[in-house]
């Protein structure tokens, strides 16, 4: 990061500087001992201000580095609509504009011209009404300087004190700028990268816990992606409690900004209830008996109301007052209206305390002690006859701890279709009442949802004693002027008494008729439900049947396709086999032809060898002159097997043998050549005519 401010190329002198106000300390974060900032001087005061004007790109260099929400200089520099567009990473909240205009009472952000800042602009001291901030000039960067803000980015992690223009006098985050010396919360907004804001807003006890949408985790104003400095308006308004919690805070679980925002939806509670419900959604044939203690200590039934107290009573005095009757807890006193709610350990002790203290005098006032309304008891109706105490307990235990759960029966032990569930906490009863009214909660396979209503249980067995009446009232005296009596027949009293009886009898008749009608409608709905269930099951079976038919058709098509593929494969294999056999046959024929050709060549070679051998032997015979050659028989045998007749050469020669006659031919003779010395073959004879005929004429 750059540690020094940008220098303007045209700047000839140093810009005006802010001075420290009087002897007032620079750090107004009361109760906080913050480390010295990087731009602070040795005595705790702010260092000299860097030059305010940067280069041509000084306004936009800090778009992604300013994690304090756009305006880090406090009230000095007002962020313009286009100078800092760090909309996605606004982790600190837009507090600079608010400190600029909303804290005029405490004078936290005003600068005073002096020796060190002779060129201070006078419009920084003018007070303006709360509302939208004025647009900043384009030549004044909203972040005081791009390089200066980058240098102070890491220094903002611990304190987020506004250095530079604000001179550490306005610690913005935390409780916001309260305008006075108690401007706390600077230790929150751990700025820069994390900016978790956990320790911030400690004055309010609430902070941005990191659940706001859009990375707004600091204790600033109007967190979330809606915190955009487009119009230079502080979207959180003048709330000093740490901001409104962000526009998207309503969708967060728990949520809650600093002093605003509020909690998110009850998604977490509903989620855990749903998870517990899934664990018991199976069959409930065998349920273990529920062992509930006879009486729970400090239960909702033991809550007493004590009225007509003095406004100076304390919890210790109440404990001392109820000490003879037992231990008390959960005391809630409203001294403005002079009443108190408290819980006694056990119900008998609560009854004793009520009887003893009700009507007693304390400091000239008559105390009134009553059992407080118990909002933890619910009446569950529209139950089927197969719901037991154990099933009722297990079913409603998902909403919270239960002290008692029982089914209401008549004097014969018959199921009355309703029950009572008493929770240990009011929040559990409220969650049960809300979810059962919003949704349909079934306990068995029947589609009759249970109906849940608050049940008013009157544990007051004392009734209304005579001392509770104000006997000075005229109505009391008029009513008590005549005592008990029976009316005489056909008298005025008897006539109007009979009318009252008829009215109540009519009510009972209509009530009974309504109950019978309700019973008939319930039976009718039950029959419709069973028929609809049967139709639904039948429709499911039809759908399953159609699905199976579709699957059957698909499988049939697949089988036919496989058969077709197998037939095609068989045909291809047959064709391949036939082609292979044809190739084998042709190959065998070629081999046979080659063998015959080789045999012929072999015979021809042997004939040539034999011819050459005969030629050699003819050369051994000798005789004759010129080119005549004779063929003598072997071993001087007169019966020579061969006789060669040579062609019409110039010099005819005949085979010479012992018994051979000249120019005589054998009856069996075979002529191998031609009688022409100039045609074909290796012809013997005159060498002048060529040697193309292998033999002239031979006789075997």
From Swiss-Prot:
Q: Which gene encodes it?
A: nonA
Q: What is this protein called?
A: Protein no-on-transient A
Q: Which residues form the signal peptide?
A: none
What does the entry list under GO cellular component?
Answer: catalytic step 2 spliceosome; nucleus; precatalytic spliceosome
Region (Disordered) location? 1-270, 568-591, 677-700
Biased-composition ranges, Gly residues, are: 70-79, 176-208, 253-266, 682-691
Where, if anywhere, are coiled coils annotated?
505-616
Q: Which domain of life is it from?
A: Eukaryota
Q: Where is the RRM domain?
A: 302-374, 376-457
An example Gene Ontology biological process: regulation of DNA-templated transcription
- Cite a single GO MF annotation: RNA binding
């Amino acid at each position: 990061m750059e540690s020094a401010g940008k220098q303007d190329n045209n700047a000839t002198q140093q810009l005006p500087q802010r001075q420290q106000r009087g002897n007032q300390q620079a750090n107004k974060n009361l109760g906080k001992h913050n480390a010295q900032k990087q731009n602070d001087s040795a005595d705790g005061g702010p260092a000299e201000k860097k030059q305010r004007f940067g280069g041509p790109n000084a306004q936009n260099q800090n778009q992604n580095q300013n994690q304090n929400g756009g305006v880090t200089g406090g009230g000095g520099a007002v962020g313009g609509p286009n100078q800092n567009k760090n909309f996605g990473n606004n982790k600190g909240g837009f507090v600079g504009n608010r400190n600029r205009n909303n804290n005029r009472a405490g004078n936290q952000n005003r600068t005073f011209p002096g020796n060190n800042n002779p060129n201070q602009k006078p419009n920084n001291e003018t007070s303006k009404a709360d509302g939208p901030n004025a647009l900043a000039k384009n030549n004044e960067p909203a972040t005081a300087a791009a390089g200066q803000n980058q240098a102070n980015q890491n220094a903002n992690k611990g304190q987020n004190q506004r250095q530079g223009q604000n001179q550490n006098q306005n610690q913005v985050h935390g409780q916001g700028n309260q305008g006075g010396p108690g401007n706390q919360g600077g230790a929150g907004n751990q700025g820069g990268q994390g900016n978790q804001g956990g320790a911030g807003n400690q004055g309010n006890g609430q902070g941005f816990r990191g659940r706001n949408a859009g990375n707004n985790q600091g204790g600033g104003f109007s967190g979330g992606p809606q915190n955009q400095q487009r119009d230079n308006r502080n979207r959180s308004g003048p709330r000093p409690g740490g901001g409104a919690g962000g526009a998207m805070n309503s969708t967060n679980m728990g949520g809650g900004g600093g002093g605003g925002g509020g909690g998110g939806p009850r998604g977490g509670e509903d989620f855990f209830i749903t998870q517990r419900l899934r664990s018991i959604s199976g069959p409930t044939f065998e349920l273990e008996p529920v062992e509930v203690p006879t009486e729970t200590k400090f239960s909702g039934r033991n809550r007493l109301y004590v009225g007509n107290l003095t406004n100076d009573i304390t919890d210790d005095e109440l404990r001392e007052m109820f000490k003879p009757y037992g231990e008390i807890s959960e005391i809630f006193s409203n001294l403005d209206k002079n009443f108190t709610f408290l819980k006694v350990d056990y119900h008998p002790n609560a009854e004793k305390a009520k009887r003893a203290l009700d009507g007693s005098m304390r400091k000239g006032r008559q105390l009134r002690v009553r059992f407080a309304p118990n909002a933890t008891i619910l009446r569950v109706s529209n139950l089927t006859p197969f719901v037991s105490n154990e099933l009722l307990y297990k079913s409603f235990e998902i909403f919270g701890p239960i002290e008692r759960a029982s089914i209401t029966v008549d004097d014969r032990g018959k199921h009355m279709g309703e029950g009572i569930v008493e929770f240990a906490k009011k929040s559990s009863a409220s969650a049960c009442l809300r979810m059962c009214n919003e949704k349909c909660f079934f306990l068995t396979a029947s589609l009759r949802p249970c109906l849940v209503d608050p049940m008013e249980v009157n544990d007051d067995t004392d009734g209304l004693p005579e001392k509770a009446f104000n006997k000075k009232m005229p109505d009391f005296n008029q009513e008590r002027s005549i005592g008990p009596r029976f009316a005489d027949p056909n008298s005025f009293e008897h006539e109007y008494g009979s009318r009252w009886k008829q009215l109540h009898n009519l009510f009972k008749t209509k009530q009974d008729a309504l109950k019978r009608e309700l019973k008939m409608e319930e039976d009718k709905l039950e029959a419709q439900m069973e028929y609809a269930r049967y139709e639904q099951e039948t429709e499911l079976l039809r759908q399953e049947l159609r699905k199976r038919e579709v699957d059957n058709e698909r499988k049939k098509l697949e089988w036919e396709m496989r058969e077709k593929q197998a037939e095609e494969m068989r045909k291809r294999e047959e064709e391949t086999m036939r082609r292979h056999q044809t190739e084998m046959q042709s190959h065998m024929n070629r081999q046979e032809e080659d063998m015959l050709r080789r045999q012929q060549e072999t015979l021809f070679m042997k004939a040539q060898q034999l011819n050459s051998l005969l030629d050699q032997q003819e050369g051994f015979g000798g005789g004759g002159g010129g080119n005549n050659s004779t063929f003598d028989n072997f071993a001087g045998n007169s019966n020579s097997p061969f006789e060669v007749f040579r062609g019409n050469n110039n010099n005819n020669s005949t085979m010479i043998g012992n018994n051979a006659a000249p120019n005589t031919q054998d009856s069996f003779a075979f002529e191998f050549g031609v009688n022409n010395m100039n045609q074909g073959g290796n012809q013997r004879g005159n060498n002048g005519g060529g040697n193309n005929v292998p033999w002239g004429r031979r006789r075997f």
